[in-house]
Amino acid sequence: MSRTLVLVRHGQSEWNLKNLFTGWRDPGLTEQGHAEAKAAGQRLKAAGLKFDIAYTSALSRAQVTCQHILDELGQPGLETIRDQALNERDYGDLSGLNKDDARAKWGEEQVHIWRRSYDVPPPGGESLKDTGARVWPYYLHTIQPHVLREETVLVAAHGNSLRALIMALEGLTPEQILKQELNTGVPIIYRLNADSTVASKEILSA
Protein backbone atom coordinates (compact mmCIF):
# COMPACT_ATOMS: atom_id res chain seq x y z
CA MET A 1 0.00 0.00 0.00
CA SER A 2 1.23 3.48 -0.76
CA ARG A 3 0.00 7.04 -0.56
CA THR A 4 0.06 7.83 -4.27
CA LEU A 5 -1.25 10.89 -6.11
CA VAL A 6 -1.08 11.05 -9.91
CA LEU A 7 -1.63 14.36 -11.70
CA VAL A 8 -2.25 14.53 -15.46
CA ARG A 9 -2.90 17.60 -17.58
CA HIS A 10 -5.52 16.86 -20.25
CA GLY A 11 -4.45 15.93 -23.77
CA GLN A 12 -4.10 18.63 -26.41
CA SER A 13 -7.41 20.44 -27.01
CA GLU A 14 -8.74 22.03 -30.19
CA TRP A 15 -8.07 25.46 -28.71
CA ASN A 16 -4.53 24.58 -27.60
CA LEU A 17 -3.90 23.81 -31.26
CA LYS A 18 -5.42 27.14 -32.37
CA ASN A 19 -3.45 29.11 -29.73
CA LEU A 20 -6.61 30.40 -28.05
CA PHE A 21 -7.15 31.31 -24.40
CA THR A 22 -9.41 28.52 -23.17
CA GLY A 23 -10.12 28.87 -19.45
CA TRP A 24 -13.64 27.63 -18.60
CA ARG A 25 -14.69 27.27 -22.25
CA ASP A 26 -15.14 23.65 -23.26
CA PRO A 27 -13.47 22.60 -26.53
CA GLY A 28 -12.83 18.92 -27.17
CA LEU A 29 -9.56 17.07 -27.62
CA THR A 30 -7.71 16.88 -30.92
CA GLU A 31 -6.73 13.51 -32.39
CA GLN A 32 -3.32 14.11 -30.85
CA GLY A 33 -4.99 14.89 -27.52
CA HIS A 34 -6.89 11.59 -27.52
CA ALA A 35 -3.65 9.78 -28.35
CA GLU A 36 -1.78 11.60 -25.55
CA ALA A 37 -4.42 10.61 -23.00
CA LYS A 38 -4.37 6.97 -24.08
CA ALA A 39 -0.57 6.95 -23.99
CA ALA A 40 -0.68 8.33 -20.44
CA GLY A 41 -2.86 5.40 -19.44
CA GLN A 42 -0.48 2.96 -21.10
CA ARG A 43 2.51 4.42 -19.25
CA LEU A 44 0.67 4.23 -15.94
CA LYS A 45 -0.25 0.61 -16.69
CA ALA A 46 3.39 -0.18 -17.48
CA ALA A 47 4.30 1.38 -14.12
CA GLY A 48 1.93 -1.06 -12.41
CA LEU A 49 -0.56 1.51 -11.15
CA LYS A 50 -4.24 0.95 -10.42
CA PHE A 51 -6.48 3.66 -9.00
CA ASP A 52 -8.92 3.61 -6.10
CA ILE A 53 -10.73 6.81 -7.11
CA ALA A 54 -10.38 9.52 -9.77
CA TYR A 55 -11.04 13.26 -9.77
CA THR A 56 -11.46 15.56 -12.73
CA SER A 57 -12.87 18.98 -13.56
CA ALA A 58 -16.28 19.98 -14.91
CA LEU A 59 -14.74 20.42 -18.39
CA SER A 60 -14.91 17.72 -21.03
CA ARG A 61 -11.26 17.82 -22.13
CA ALA A 62 -10.18 16.73 -18.66
CA GLN A 63 -13.05 14.24 -18.26
CA VAL A 64 -12.29 12.52 -21.58
CA THR A 65 -8.59 12.37 -20.68
CA CYS A 66 -9.50 10.78 -17.36
CA GLN A 67 -11.72 8.19 -19.06
CA HIS A 68 -9.07 7.28 -21.65
CA ILE A 69 -6.59 6.66 -18.82
CA LEU A 70 -9.02 4.48 -16.89
CA ASP A 71 -9.96 2.56 -20.04
CA GLU A 72 -6.29 1.78 -20.74
CA LEU A 73 -5.92 0.54 -17.16
CA GLY A 74 -8.95 -1.73 -17.46
CA GLN A 75 -10.85 0.39 -14.90
CA PRO A 76 -13.55 2.04 -17.06
CA GLY A 77 -16.17 2.06 -14.30
CA LEU A 78 -13.99 3.48 -11.51
CA GLU A 79 -15.67 6.04 -9.26
CA THR A 80 -14.87 9.43 -10.78
CA ILE A 81 -15.71 12.74 -9.10
CA ARG A 82 -16.18 15.78 -11.36
CA ASP A 83 -15.92 19.22 -9.77
CA GLN A 84 -15.43 22.74 -11.12
CA ALA A 85 -13.01 23.39 -8.25
CA LEU A 86 -10.47 21.64 -10.51
CA ASN A 87 -11.35 23.71 -13.60
CA GLU A 88 -8.72 25.62 -15.53
CA ARG A 89 -7.93 29.18 -14.52
CA ASP A 90 -10.75 31.44 -15.75
CA TYR A 91 -9.28 33.79 -18.35
CA GLY A 92 -12.30 36.12 -18.25
CA ASP A 93 -12.40 38.54 -21.19
CA LEU A 94 -9.45 36.73 -22.81
CA SER A 95 -11.41 33.47 -23.14
CA GLY A 96 -11.81 32.42 -26.75
CA LEU A 97 -9.33 34.99 -28.07
CA ASN A 98 -6.28 34.12 -30.12
CA LYS A 99 -3.23 35.05 -28.08
CA ASP A 100 -1.85 37.21 -30.90
CA ASP A 101 -5.19 39.05 -31.18
CA ALA A 102 -5.15 39.66 -27.43
CA ARG A 103 -1.66 41.17 -27.70
CA ALA A 104 -2.87 43.43 -30.51
CA LYS A 105 -5.80 44.62 -28.38
CA TRP A 106 -4.14 45.10 -24.98
CA GLY A 107 -0.44 45.18 -25.80
CA GLU A 108 2.17 42.46 -25.49
CA GLU A 109 3.42 43.57 -22.07
CA GLN A 110 -0.06 43.64 -20.51
CA VAL A 111 -1.00 40.21 -21.87
CA HIS A 112 2.33 38.82 -20.65
CA ILE A 113 1.57 40.16 -17.16
CA TRP A 114 -1.86 38.53 -17.16
CA ARG A 115 -0.43 35.21 -18.35
CA ARG A 116 2.70 35.02 -16.25
CA SER A 117 2.17 37.03 -13.08
CA TYR A 118 1.01 35.18 -9.98
CA ASP A 119 -1.61 37.58 -8.68
CA VAL A 120 -2.77 39.87 -11.53
CA PRO A 121 -6.00 38.58 -13.13
CA PRO A 122 -7.20 39.48 -16.63
CA PRO A 123 -10.48 41.46 -16.78
CA GLY A 124 -13.29 39.31 -15.42
CA GLY A 125 -10.96 36.38 -14.79
CA GLU A 126 -8.68 34.71 -12.26
CA SER A 127 -5.01 34.95 -11.43
CA LEU A 128 -3.02 31.83 -10.59
CA LYS A 129 -3.35 32.89 -6.95
CA ASP A 130 -7.15 32.97 -7.33
CA THR A 131 -7.09 29.53 -8.96
CA GLY A 132 -5.09 28.15 -6.05
CA ALA A 133 -7.59 29.62 -3.60
CA ARG A 134 -10.20 27.15 -4.87
CA VAL A 135 -7.99 24.21 -5.88
CA TRP A 136 -5.95 23.80 -2.69
CA PRO A 137 -8.86 23.76 -0.20
CA TYR A 138 -10.65 21.23 -2.42
CA TYR A 139 -7.55 19.06 -2.44
CA LEU A 140 -7.11 19.28 1.34
CA HIS A 141 -10.73 18.51 2.20
CA THR A 142 -11.68 16.07 -0.55
CA ILE A 143 -8.69 14.46 -2.28
CA GLN A 144 -5.92 14.32 0.32
CA PRO A 145 -7.89 12.18 2.82
CA HIS A 146 -8.04 9.38 0.22
CA VAL A 147 -4.30 9.59 -0.40
CA LEU A 148 -3.53 9.51 3.32
CA ARG A 149 -5.66 6.35 3.64
CA GLU A 150 -2.99 4.75 1.44
CA GLU A 151 -5.12 4.89 -1.68
CA THR A 152 -3.90 5.63 -5.21
CA VAL A 153 -5.68 8.69 -6.59
CA LEU A 154 -5.85 10.12 -10.13
CA VAL A 155 -6.43 13.83 -10.79
CA ALA A 156 -6.95 14.72 -14.46
CA ALA A 157 -7.20 18.48 -14.78
CA HIS A 158 -5.60 21.54 -16.39
CA GLY A 159 -2.29 23.35 -16.70
CA ASN A 160 -3.01 26.11 -14.21
CA SER A 161 -5.21 24.22 -11.75
CA LEU A 162 -2.49 21.57 -11.52
CA ARG A 163 0.23 24.22 -11.33
CA ALA A 164 -1.57 25.74 -8.32
CA LEU A 165 -1.79 22.30 -6.71
CA ILE A 166 1.87 21.52 -7.36
CA MET A 167 2.90 24.88 -5.90
CA ALA A 168 1.22 24.03 -2.59
CA LEU A 169 2.28 20.37 -2.57
CA GLU A 170 5.95 21.17 -3.13
CA GLY A 171 6.06 24.47 -1.23
CA LEU A 172 7.21 26.41 -4.29
CA THR A 173 7.40 30.18 -4.58
CA PRO A 174 5.33 32.04 -7.19
CA GLU A 175 8.52 32.60 -9.19
CA GLN A 176 9.33 28.88 -9.17
CA ILE A 177 5.87 27.68 -10.19
CA LEU A 178 5.51 30.23 -12.98
CA LYS A 179 8.62 28.76 -14.63
CA GLN A 180 7.15 25.25 -14.68
CA GLU A 181 5.55 24.01 -17.88
CA LEU A 182 3.17 21.07 -17.64
CA ASN A 183 3.05 19.10 -20.86
CA THR A 184 -0.27 17.69 -22.01
CA GLY A 185 -0.89 14.03 -21.21
CA VAL A 186 2.22 13.50 -19.07
CA PRO A 187 1.56 11.81 -15.69
CA ILE A 188 3.28 13.12 -12.56
CA ILE A 189 3.42 10.56 -9.74
CA TYR A 190 3.74 11.77 -6.15
CA ARG A 191 4.28 9.46 -3.19
CA LEU A 192 3.32 11.15 0.07
CA ASN A 193 4.55 10.66 3.61
CA ALA A 194 2.08 10.00 6.43
CA ASP A 195 2.27 13.70 7.36
CA SER A 196 1.13 14.61 3.79
CA THR A 197 4.52 15.94 2.68
CA VAL A 198 6.00 14.79 -0.64
CA ALA A 199 8.28 11.74 -0.33
CA SER A 200 9.05 11.41 -4.05
CA LYS A 201 8.07 12.71 -7.47
CA GLU A 202 8.33 10.94 -10.82
CA ILE A 203 7.39 12.28 -14.26
CA LEU A 204 6.35 9.60 -16.76
CA SER A 205 7.48 11.25 -19.98
CA ALA A 206 7.06 9.52 -23.31
Curated annotation (Swiss-Prot):
Substrate binds at residues 9-16, 22-23, 61, 88-91, 99, 115-116, 159-160. Its EC number is 5.4.2.11. It catalyses: (2R)-2-phosphoglycerate = (2R)-3-phosphoglycerate. It comes from the Bacteria. The active site is at H10, E88. The record marks H158 as: Transition state stabilizer. One of its GO terms (molecular function) is phosphoglycerate mutase activity. Keywords: Gluconeogenesis, Glycolysis, Isomerase. Pfam families: His_Phos_1. It is an enzyme of class 5 (isomerase). Pathway: Carbohydrate degradation; glycolysis; pyruvate from D-glyceraldehyde 3-phosphate: step 3/5. The keyword Cell membrane does not apply. PROSITE patterns: PG_MUTASE (PS00175). InterPro entries: His_Pase_superF_clade-1, His_PPase_superfam, PG/BPGM_mutase_AS, Phosphogly_mut1. One of its GO terms (biological process) is gluconeogenesis. Belongs to the phosphoglycerate mutase family. BPG-dependent PGAM subfamily. Homodimer. Catalyzes the interconversion of 2-phosphoglycerate and 3-phosphoglycerate. This is 2,3-bisphosphoglycerate-dependent phosphoglycerate mutase. It comes from Brucella melitensis biotype 2 (strain ATCC 23457). The gene is gpmA.
